[in-house]
């Protein structure tokens, strides 16, 4: 069992960026992971099972919306929306590939370090995750250095083993989106085939739904 004594490192480290680097180093030990993920905003709630593999493969099998799938093999992003029987497909540019991995790898966290200012939200002391939970976390506040970033502000809640438990992001349009990660299992040897996806043949395909493909 992980005890609260682990959190002493947060207090011993004098700067938030140094603590953030501990989180980045922890993710540097991870080849892959699976977790239950919930994404919520003021008017939307979705949840499902997340699979991640370095450097930039990701898949979410959604329970809500039921049957929806988001998958990227690092080169192509696909989103299957069964409600409309459509597949949205996007050939990824380099920056978009990085965006998928931003909060799931040592490299991605280093990108955040370069593009955001980092501070403790209130102090380096552990606090409850929220008013309804006694789970203890250290909270970091990240503010964008450039308006080119997708989120103007991020609040990262970090567990005693230096894993991200929750991300609260504020978009450029001031929309707040919360990502919760529960039951994280690391280095499971997730096969490459997990990130291969063939949508139903009857689904309508829409290419380049984010931006025009390159080449």
Predicted stretch roles:
Residues 43, 83-85, 173:
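Solvent-exposed strand-loop boundary residues in beta-sheet-rich modules
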């Amino acid at each position: 069992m992980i005890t609260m004594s682990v959190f002493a490192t947060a207090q011993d480290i004098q700067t938030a960026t140094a603590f953030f680097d501990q989180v980045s180093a922890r993710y540097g030990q991870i080849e892959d992971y699976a977790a239950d993920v919930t994404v919520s905003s003021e008017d939307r709630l979705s949840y499902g099972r997340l699979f991640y593999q370095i450097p930039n493969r990701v898949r979410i099998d959604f329970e809500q919306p039921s049957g929806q799938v988001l998958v990227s093999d690092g080169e192509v992003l696909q989103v299957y929306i069964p409600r409309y029987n459509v597949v949205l497909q996007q050939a990824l540019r380099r920056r978009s590939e990085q965006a998928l991995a931003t909060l799931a790898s040592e490299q991605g966290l280093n990108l955040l370090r370069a593009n955001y200012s980092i501070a403790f939200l209130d102090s380096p002391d552990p606090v409850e995750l929220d008013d309804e939970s006694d789970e203890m976390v250290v909270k970091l506040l990240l503010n964008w250095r450039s308006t080119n970033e997708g989120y103007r502000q991020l609040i990262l809640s970090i567990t005693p083993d230096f894993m991200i438990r929750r991300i609260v992001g504020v978009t450029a349009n001031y929309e707040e989106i919360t990502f919760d990660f529960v039951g994280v299992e690391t280095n499971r040897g997730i096969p490459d085939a997990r990130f291969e996806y063939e949508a139903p043949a009857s689904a309508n395909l829409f290419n380049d739904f984010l931006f025009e493909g390159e080449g």
